[in-house]
């Protein structure tokens, strides 16, 4: 996801065709590689669907209308309009829905729950996508060479481990190839589809939705269940929204309707035509659709496409983690910028290694793309359902759509998403438990961190010395003042920071200027420089400064303070000292959280990145003071 920020920076100057190609390379990798396994999974996934004329046309009709309804209608017409100052993605949407429901605390809490659970499922998706995509590409080798079955997993692992190992170096150089490679991929998909359709043109009858309805009538027992496989054609739909901030709605929409949708539909119908003519080809209709001479080049192109799709979700996980950190739901981590030109190209080591471990376990544990498909559907449909719920709140409470218009539409959207999710629920017991368990663990971690930070602030505030009383005491008994500016980071605006009290106790001095600095993260992605800071003078050389950042802004505190042009405040590097407080949490029987959650929070706090690195403070101008807090 963050791969594209370089394009966003030059968005105004980029030609439409260049931006469209770039969008294809980043946004559509996941959904673009779905033809590798979707139709095969429908008939080979243990659903009990016979490979008959009516079943093939019925399944194709379901795929066709799913792409039209979910992607072309829901995402393109509605979800992409729910941008948070141009940014998309479930964390940005959650911030928007939280703002929309600000007057309704219970509803706001529900929006946070849906947003966090959708985000947690996205992390599961970020593990499943690389595993299932690369495995499905490698499985083409079974058709090209005999006896390679047992080499598929090792080769997939080599590719995937290599992909994660290069993340710290960035992908800016090879990233310029993503667009052209994926455009080539979609052109090949379309060409293969046309080739297949020419063999059995009657497959085009599946455009008629009656074939989809007929499928449910013929297969009453498995009609809904089969949607659990059909939804694989929609994997990656969430990326359309998540990457909107990098390219904008129009390039993403144009790429979908001009290139991606036609190529996908042609390929699915081409595979269907192939299976109509020869039911045995259902074992791998994607690769068997290609002429024999084209098989190896197609495997190579498929591998490149799946690597690009994997890179997109890995970068997306990095970007979403940054948003979650700044919104206060994940502990601070070391964030490395991998490009001096593109601000959004970042690397987060902890996330990278966690994803790599998850991917390796998935590949070794499931061994094939078909086995992984069960896990895939649960993550995809869960995230889609959470997105629809959040968008519904935005439509009704922020956009103020008339209920008579909005409610019937939203019911239809939620009904379809609910059917897809319900179809995947039974898969939880057939391999789909992984994304649910991973999502549950991540949800617990995020909510524990958020609640723990709230409780920590409350405990620190208890018995805090009010600032007016402290300043009044200084007027009565002035301490020795030294030259320079002391900046104390604090979450409260009305109490004296512990670091300031400790400094007074041990050093018996105050600086000429004392700044109580609070950093506030807004529910919007960016805050303009003109609105970055607020300044209030308390007298006696004391000032309150509040810095405002968006959830994708880089919180560079020294750079932000340099914009504060007040003659009485001097933030020059050699005259400014930063005082930080480092809390150590001691779990106790006090009210707040369960003891195990307090212990978990204490562990996360101990291992979180401190303010020094996160706020880009100069190492040689920082004094850190520790304090113990019972929770």
UniProtKB/Swiss-Prot annotation:
It is a multi-pass membrane protein. One of its GO terms (cellular component) is plasma membrane. The chain crosses the membrane at residues 17-37, 56-76, 109-129, 147-167, 174-194, 215-235, 256-276, 288-308, 346-366, 378-398, 403-423, 428-448. One of its GO terms (molecular function) is symporter activity. Keywords: Cell inner membrane, Cell membrane, Ion transport, Membrane, Potassium, Potassium transport, Symport, Transmembrane, Transmembrane helix, Transport. The keyword Membrane applies. Disulfide bonds: none annotated. Belongs to the HAK/KUP transporter (TC 2.A.72) family. Transport of potassium into the cell. Likely operates as a K(+):H(+) symporter. This is Probable potassium transport system protein Kup. It comes from Pseudomonas syringae pv. syringae (strain B728a). The gene is kup.
């Amino acid at each position: 996801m963050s791969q594209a920020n370089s394009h966003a920076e030059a968005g105004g100057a980029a030609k439409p065709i260049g931006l469209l190609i770039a969008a294809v390379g980043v946004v559509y990798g996941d959904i673009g590689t779905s033809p590798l396994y979707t139709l095969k999974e429908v008939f080979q996934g243990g659903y009990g669907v016979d490979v008959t004329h009516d079943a093939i046309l019925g399944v194709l009709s379901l795929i066709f209308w799913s792409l039209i309804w979910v992607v072309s209608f829901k995402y393109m017409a509605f979800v992409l309009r729910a941008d948070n100052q141009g940014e998309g993605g479930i964390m940005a949407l959650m911030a928007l829905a939280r703002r929309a429901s600000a007057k309704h605390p219970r509803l706001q809490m529900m929006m946070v729950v849906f947003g966090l659970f959708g985000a947690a499922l996205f992390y599961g998706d970020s593990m499943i996508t690389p595993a299932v995509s690369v495995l499905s590409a490698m499985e083409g080798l079974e058709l090209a060479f005999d006896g390679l079955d047992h080499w598929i997993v090792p080769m997939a692992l080599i590719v995937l481990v290599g992909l994660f190992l290069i993340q710290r170096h960035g992908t800016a150089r090879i990233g310029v190839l993503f667009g052209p490679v994926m455009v080539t991929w979609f052109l090949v998909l379309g060409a293969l589809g046309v080739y297949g359709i020419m063999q059995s043109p009657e497959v085009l009858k599946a455009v008629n939705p009656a074939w989809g309805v007929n499928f449910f009538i013929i297969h009453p027992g498995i009609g809904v269940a089969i949607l659990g496989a059909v939804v694989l054609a929609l994997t990656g739909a969430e990326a359309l929204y998540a990457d909107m901030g990098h390219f904008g709605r129009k390039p993403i929409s144009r790429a979908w309707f001009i290139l991606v949708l036609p190529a996908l539909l042609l390929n699915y119908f081409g595979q269907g035509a192939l299976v109509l003519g020869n039911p045995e080809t259902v074992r791998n209709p994607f690769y068997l659709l290609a002429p024999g001479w084209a098989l190896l080049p197609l495997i190579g192109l498929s591998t490149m496409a799946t690597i690009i799709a994997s890179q997109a979700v890995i970068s997306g996980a990095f970007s979403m983690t940054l948003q979650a950190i700044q919104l206060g739901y994940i502990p601070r981590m070391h964030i490395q910028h991998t490009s001096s030109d593109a601000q959004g190209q970042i690397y987060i080591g902890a996330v990278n290694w966690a994803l790599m471990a998850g991917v390796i376990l998935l590949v070794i544990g499931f061994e094939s793309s078909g086995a992984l498909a069960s896990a895939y559907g649960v993550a995809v449909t869960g995230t889609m359902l959470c997105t629809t719920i959040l968008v519904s709140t935005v439509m009704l409470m922020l956009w103020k759509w008339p209920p008579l218009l909005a409610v019937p539409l939203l019911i239809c959207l939620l009904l379809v998403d609910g059917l897809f999710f319900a179809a995947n629920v039974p898969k939880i017991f057939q391999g789909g438990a992984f994304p649910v368990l991973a999502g549950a663990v991540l949800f617990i971690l995020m909510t524990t961190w958020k609640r723990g930070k709230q409780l920590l602030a409350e405990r620190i505030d208890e018995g805090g010395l009010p600032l007016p009383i402290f300043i009044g005491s200084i007027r009565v008994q002035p301490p020795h003042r030294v030259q320079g500016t002391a900046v104390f980071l604090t979450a409260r605006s009305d109490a004296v920071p512990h670091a300031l009290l400790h400094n007074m106790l041990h050093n018996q001095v105050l600086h000429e200027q004392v700044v109580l600095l609070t950093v506030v993260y807004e529910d919007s992605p960016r805050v303009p420089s003109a609105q970055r800071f607020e300044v209030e003078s308390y007298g006696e050389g004391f000032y309150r400064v509040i810095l405002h950042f968006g959830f994708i802004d880089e919180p560079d505190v020294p750079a932000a303070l340099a914009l504060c042009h007040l003659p009485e405040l001097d933030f020059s590097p050699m005259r400014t000292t930063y005082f930080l407080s480092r809390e150590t949490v001691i779990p106790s029987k006090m009210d707040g959280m369960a003891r195990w959650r307090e212990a978990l929070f204490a562990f996360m706090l101990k291992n979180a990145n401190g303010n020094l690195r996160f706020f880009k403070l100069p190492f040689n101008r920082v004094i850190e003071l520790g304090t113990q807090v019972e929770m």
